[in-house]
Amino acid sequence: MPLDAAVKKSIMAEYATSEGDTGSPEVQVAMLTQRIRDLTEHLKTHQHDHHSRRGLLLLVGQRRNLLKYMAKKDINRYRSIIERLGIRR
C-alpha cells in the first residue's frame, strides 16, 4: 500500500535534515514506519491476507537495517528518531 503524496510531503517536511531532503535515513525510517502502521491496521481487519503480511515483514526488516545503520553511524540521531517516531527498539 503506497503512501499518498500529501502524507509523503508532510513526513518529509517533518523529518528532513535539510531543505529538499528525501533520502536521509530519518526520512526513510519515517516513511517505512508510516507504511508499517498502515499495513498493521489493514491486517487487523484482514487476518488472512498473507501476501500483505509478508510485505509487512519485509518493511520491518528494511526499517531494522536502516536503524542499525543509524545506531552505528550516529547514536544521537538514532535515539532522536526512535523517540520522535515512538517505536520501541
Swiss-Prot record:
Keyword presence, Lyase: no
UniProt keyword Ribosomal protein present: yes
GO cellular component: a single term: cytosolic small ribosomal subunit
GO MF, one annotated term: structural constituent of ribosome
SMART domains reported for this sequence: Ribosomal_S15
Pfam families from the UniProt entry: Ribosomal_S15
UniProtKB keywords: Ribonucleoprotein, Ribosomal protein, RNA-binding, rRNA-binding
Database matches in Gene3D superfamilies: 6.10.250.3130, S15/NS1, RNA-binding
GO BP term (any one): translation
Family: Belongs to the universal ribosomal protein uS15 family.
Quaternary assembly: Part of the 30S ribosomal subunit. Forms a bridge to the 50S subunit in the 70S ribosome, contacting the 23S rRNA.
PANTHER family reported in the protein's UniProt record: RIBOSOMAL PROTEIN S15, BACTERIAL AND ORGANELLAR, SMALL RIBOSOMAL SUBUNIT PROTEIN US15M
NCBIfam families the UniProt entry points to: S15_bact
Its biological purpose: One of the primary rRNA binding proteins, it binds directly to 16S rRNA where it helps nucleate assembly of the platform of the 30S subunit by binding and bridging several RNA helices of the 16S rRNA.
Protein name as it appears in the record: Small ribosomal subunit protein uS15
Upper lineage: Bacteria, Bacillati, Actinomycetota, Actinomycetes, Kineosporiales
Gene: rpsO
